[in-house]
């Protein structure tokens, strides 16, 4: 620590200290330590919607999700508004967790869209993570499976083929 203190280089002894820790430093008297107030983004919904919201690094730079997509706006103090319905997001998150556990699956993903305007109303992944505490998660938890994983289309493409058949009168309702 002494080498860091006498160095001309700026060094952090500790970042994001609590008010109690700050008070203890003040009580030490006159010492050559500078304190600096830093902004910190707080994620009030914790794990709910974590893959949509994303996360930031120690310097509040967006690394993933909306935090990355809107990093400049957020760092400039602007608000952003998403189409996500937090009540729906929470309900789907709980259902997804139950289904994954019921079938002993390793992971799962759900996307719910408004068919009238294509807005994303809910996007969930399991496992998820708490962006307030990235130390308790790993890369697998932070992977947005709904958008970043590869899946074989299989039978999910059949409704599109059928719809196309109806559009071109190849398939009739009676068939």
List the model feature ranges, each with a label.
Residues 35, 53, 66, 124, ...:
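Long, contiguous hydrophobic alpha-helical segments, chiefly transmembrane helices and signal peptides
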Residues 46, 64, 121-126, 133, ...:
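Short, solvent-exposed loop/turn and secondary-structure capping segments
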Residues 56-59, 122-128:
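Short beta->alpha transition motifs characteristic of CBS
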């Amino acid at each position: 620590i002494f080498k860091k203190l006498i160095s001309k280089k700026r060094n952090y002894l500790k970042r994001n200290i609590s008010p109690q820790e700050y008070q203890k430093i003040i009580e030490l008297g006159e010492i050559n330590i500078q304190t600096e107030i830093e902004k910190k983004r707080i994620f009030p919904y914790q794990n709910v919607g974590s893959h949509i919201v994303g996360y930031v690094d120690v310097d509040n730079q967006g690394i993933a999700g909306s935090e990355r997509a809107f990093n400049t706006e957020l760092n400039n103090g602007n608000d952003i508004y998403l189409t996500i319905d937090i009540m729906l997001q929470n309900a789907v998150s709980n259902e997804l967790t139950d289904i994954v556990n019921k079938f002993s699956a390793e992971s799962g993903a759900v996307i719910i869209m408004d068919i009238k305007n294509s807005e994303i109303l809910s996007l969930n992944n399991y496992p998820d993570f708490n962006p307030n505490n990235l130390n308790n998660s790993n890369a697998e938890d932070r992977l947005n499976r709904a958008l970043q994983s590869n899946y074989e289309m299989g039978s999910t493409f059949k409704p599109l083929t059928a719809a196309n058949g109806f559009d071109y009168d190849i398939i009739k309702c009676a068939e």
